[in-house]
Amino acid sequence: MRAEQGDILRVSGINWPVIVVSNNHFNAIGEVIVCPILKNIPGNAVHLPIRAITPSGEIEGHIACEHVRHLDLNERRYTKVYSLQMTDYLDISDTLIALFDFR
């Protein structure tokens, strides 16, 4: 199973879910760029709310878009728990682009 953009993962050694933000071309090598989904942070311009009902329970919190991390999934166990629709992913994508908008 390969992780894809918009997937919410549970990864061994990480206590919170993460969302895959890297594109599928990059993800094909087994590495991903992710942002954490955290419960105890306030919403703001870079903390986007998320609520997903999964077979294993509910994921609710904020995506911390400023906490971008690289993970090598070839070296970690992980489980895909949910996949966002592309329309739901657009706010995340827009926020990440805005963080790196060089002028």
Give the role of each language-model region:
Residues 1-103:
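Conserved functional hotspots at enzyme active or ligand-binding sites that engage polyanionic ligands
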